[in-house]
């Protein structure tokens, strides 16, 4: 018990002295989730695209917009701090297979119990993206931000 308490105080000290924000502490816990990525095993069947409540899934080589499937308009600052023009076409993330725009993916949190793309994918190529780690709270905030509810 004493070691756990000492560890907690050590972590608290680092947060206070080094100026870590509380949101950074959340990234250390085990309740983190990740945006979904479509792997190169994709067979381009398209089953995933209509299932996404955020319109975050696009066909290979398709340009995409932040405003598609959301209530975002004009210049916006995303929850991750990035400023974008919601109406501007974005470059495709993949030229070979379907892709998911990570800034729009909420893992269906706030809509469904599980990511719908993964639920319908016949080859199980919709998997967590380890490069885009977010908490459930962050994903819910992103959903609310995009859909204004």
What are these regions (language model features)?
Residues 10, 15, 27-34, 58-149:
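Flanking helices and flexible, charged tails adjoining ferredoxin-like Fe-S electron-transfer domains
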Residues 37-38:
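Local sequence-structure signature of Cys/Sec-based thiol-disulfide redox active-site neighborhoods
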Residues 43-53, 106, 118-122:
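Cys/His/Pro-rich metal-binding microdomains
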């Amino acid at each position: 018990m004493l070691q756990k308490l000492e560890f907690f105080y050590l972590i608290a000290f680092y947060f206070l002295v080094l100026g870590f924000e509380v949101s950074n502490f959340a990234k250390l816990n085990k309740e983190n989730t990740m945006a979904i990525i479509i792997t190169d095993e994709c067979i381009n069947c398209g089953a995933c695209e209509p299932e996404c409540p955020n319109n975050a899934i696009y066909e290979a080589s398709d340009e995409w917009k932040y405003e598609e499937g959301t209530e975002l308009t004009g210049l916006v600052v995303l929850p991750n701090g990035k400023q974008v023009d919601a109406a501007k076409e974005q470059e495709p993330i993949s030229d070979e297979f379907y892709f998911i725009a990570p800034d729009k993916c909420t893992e269906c949190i706030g809509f469904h119990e599980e990511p719908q793309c993964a639920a319908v994918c016949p080859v199980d190529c919709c998997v967590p993206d380890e490069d885009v780690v977010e908490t459930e709270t962050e994903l819910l905030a992103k959903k609310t931000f995009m859909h204004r509810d």
